[in-house]
């Protein structure tokens, strides 16, 4: 008898290849050191995670520009060119998801730290997201799942 009834997938980095590097590597002319400095000091992961927890991207961008006006153009790109950060599905993981769904042995849901403002773009781009019985999006719930 199978004791596992439910399977939970994360999305970013598991089923979907997302990275700001796809935008900023070009903007920094391949200079990884400068790009990483920008991530560590201007558009930080903590800053992005705040939007994943439901904070307005527009407000967050405006506030960040006030803090770092010299970087206005680059800050605006973070959400202004967000679609370019969203690449392809991760084939092996999607294949596994499809096999699990086809088996009809499990309830399969997704749990993701993702902004409610950008998640509809992912839904439109990735048809496999319709395979889930439910998707819990941190930005819709106004909280994030912990990383530690």
What are the language-model segments listed below?
Residues 116-148:
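Substrate-recognition "cap/lid" segment bordering the active-site pocket of phosphatases
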Residues 1-43:
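Active-site neighborhood of HAD-like aspartate-dependent phosphohydrolases
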Residues 24, 42, 61-65, 78-83, ...:
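Hydrophobic alpha-helical core bundles mediating ligand binding, dimerization, or RNAP-core interactions
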Residues 73-109:
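Short, acidic loop-to-helix structural element flanking the phosphoryl-transfer center
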Residues 48-79:
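A metal-dependent, Asp-based hydrolase signature
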Residues 14-15, 20-22, 114-118, 141-143:
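Short, solvent-exposed loop/turn segments at secondary-structure junctions
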Residues 30-41, 68-80:
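Short, surface-exposed acidic
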Residues 10-13, 54, 100, 110, ...:
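Generic structural signal for small/hydrophobic residues in well-ordered secondary structure
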């Amino acid at each position: 008898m199978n004791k596992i009834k439910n399977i939970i997938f994360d999305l970013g980095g598991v089923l979907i290849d997302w990275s700001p590097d796809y935008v900023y590597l070009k903007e920094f002319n391949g200079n990884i050191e400068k790009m990483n400095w920008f991530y560590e000091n201007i558009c930080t992961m903590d800053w992005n995670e705040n939007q994943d927890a439901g904070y307005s991207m527009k407000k967050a961008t405006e506030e960040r520009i006030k803090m770092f006006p010299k970087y206005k153009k680059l800050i605006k790109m973070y959400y202004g060119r967000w679609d370019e950060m969203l690449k392809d599905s991760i084939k092996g993981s999607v294949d596994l998801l499809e096999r699990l769904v086809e088996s009809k042995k499990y309830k399969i849901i997704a749990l993701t730290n993702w902004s409610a403002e950008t998640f509809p773009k992912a839904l439109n781009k990735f048809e496999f997201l319709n395979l889930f019985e439910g998707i819990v999006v941190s930005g819709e719930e106004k909280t994030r799942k912990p990383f530690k």
